[in-house]
């Protein structure tokens, strides 16, 4: 699976918001992740439309989680920002499509078991098969 910049920064911002527990300005989040404010705010807008983030403009404004961190999974974020976890195919070997599809599905199943609350709490995420 190739982790896109949108996914990495979006998930990072959500984890920061979960840990903060209060509104955080977009420029503060962007500075923390070393990315432009405009780029991160575009990602946050997608997360807002999906119902994960709320925002308010002004001196006492910022972004915050619109739902409890325990109700948002990494799979939710992947689907919102990237559509789905798809293993990037580097070759065109015949007969491997089902292998790549199985790996992609296993990735999404694992991501469904991880919540923002778990990640923001600093828990060591270990998956078992």
Residue ranges and their predicted role:
Residues 49-52, 80:
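Residue cluster at the C-terminal edge of the helix-turn-helix DNA-binding motif
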Residues 90-129:
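C-terminal regulatory/oligomerization modules of transcriptional regulators
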Residues 51-66:
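Beta-hairpin "wing" of winged helix-turn-helix
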Residues 3-36, 64:
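N-terminal helix-turn-helix DNA-binding core of bacterial DNA-binding proteins
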Residues 15, 45-46:
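Core alpha-helical elements of the protein kinase catalytic domain
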Residues 31, 48-49:
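Alpha-helical residues within the helix-turn-helix
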Residues 69-94:
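Conserved segment of winged-helix/HTH DNA-binding domains
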């Amino acid at each position: 699976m190739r982790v896109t910049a949108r996914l990495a920064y979006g998930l990072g911002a959500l984890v920061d918001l979960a840990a903060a527990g209060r509104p955080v300005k977009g420029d503060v989040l962007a500075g923390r992740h070393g990315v432009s404010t405009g780029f991160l705010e575009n990602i946050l807008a997608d997360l807002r439309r999906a119902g994960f983030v709320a925002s308010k403009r002004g001196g006492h404004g910022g972004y915050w989680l619109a739902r409890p961190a325990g109700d948002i999974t990494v799979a939710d974020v992947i689907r919102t920002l990237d559509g789905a976890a798809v293993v990037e195919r580097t070759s065109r070997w015949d007969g491997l499509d089902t292998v790549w599809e199985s790996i992609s599905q296993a990735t999404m199943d694992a991501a469904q078991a991880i919540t923002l609350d778990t990640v923001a709490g600093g828990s060591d995420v270990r998956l078992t098969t």
